[in-house]
Structure formats: structure tokens, C-alpha cells
Amino acid sequence: KMLDAYARVFPVKDLNFTIGQMRVPFTIDAHRSPHQQYFANRSFIAKQVGNVRDVGLTSAYRHKGDFPFILEGGLFNGSGLTNQKEWHKTLNYSIKAQLLPGKNWNVTLSTQMIKPEDVRINMYDAGIYYQNNRFHIEAEYLYKMYGHNAFKDVHAVNSFVNYDLPL
């Protein structure tokens, strides 16, 4: 099945707009390419809790100054990957900020609102990683809250330390 089909334009340096079917900008791990994965699959948070592809429009801005950061945000149809035959009245949104305070550091903060049926779901995610020549240390926390107390709130934590063996 087709996962992504989108067009991306770069009207000015460090700014882009994307329209089409794509992964929603959310979590620290969801946008890693397969060759950048640390395990056989994505983390639990990226795969099970924050794994959303949808049809929509996003914008991203990269700042490369003294305190570099990347801001991404988008509006989405809300029907998800498998049900694109109808347009929902409520648009979903996602906002993601990657703060790059030092050469080897990444702090990611993101929020997402989806409404797959009649229940609104708000998710908040915070992650941090440190990468040097051999070590990758990462931790991520996600809080998922269902509207009208439809389900209990979800707390998910993912953390790991990876050591690369030289070949």
C-alpha cells in the first residue's frame, strides 16, 4: 500500500510547504529513515501511539543561527491513512519543535489533536537525545488524553542507550 504521496515546495531558503499524504510531524522518532532506526522497527511511541499518516498541508522552517531550531506544523483531513473518501468537518493539527541547543543535542516538543470519530484526542510529546561518536542516549515521554473521559489517559515512556561498535 502507498504510504506517502506529496509535493513539497521551497519558496525561500529554510522554508518549505508540503501538501499530500504524509507522516504527521509528531514524536522524536517517527521521521527517522529506516537506515537511521536503532531497532528492527520504530520505537513503541512512534509506531503504536504516535504513528499517524494523513492528508493535509504542512509548513516547516529551519533556523540555523546561534540557537538552531526546526518548527513544523500542519492541518490534516483527520481520516487517517486508510479512509480518504470523506473530508471531516474538524481538521486535525500537529505542531513540532526541534531545539538544537548544542552540536550533539536534540530536544523535541510536539503536540497533536486528532478526532478520528466522535472523541477528540490530544497528545503531548517531549523527547531528548544526545549523540556522540559512539553513544546515542535517548528518552521520550508521551501523554495522550481522550475527550469527555472516553478512556483513561495514556502515559508512554521510551528510553535507551545505544553503543556503536567499530567495524
For the regions a language model picked out, list residue spans one by one.
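Outer-membrane beta-barrel and related beta-rich outer-membrane complex signature
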Residues: 29-33, 83-85, 121, 151
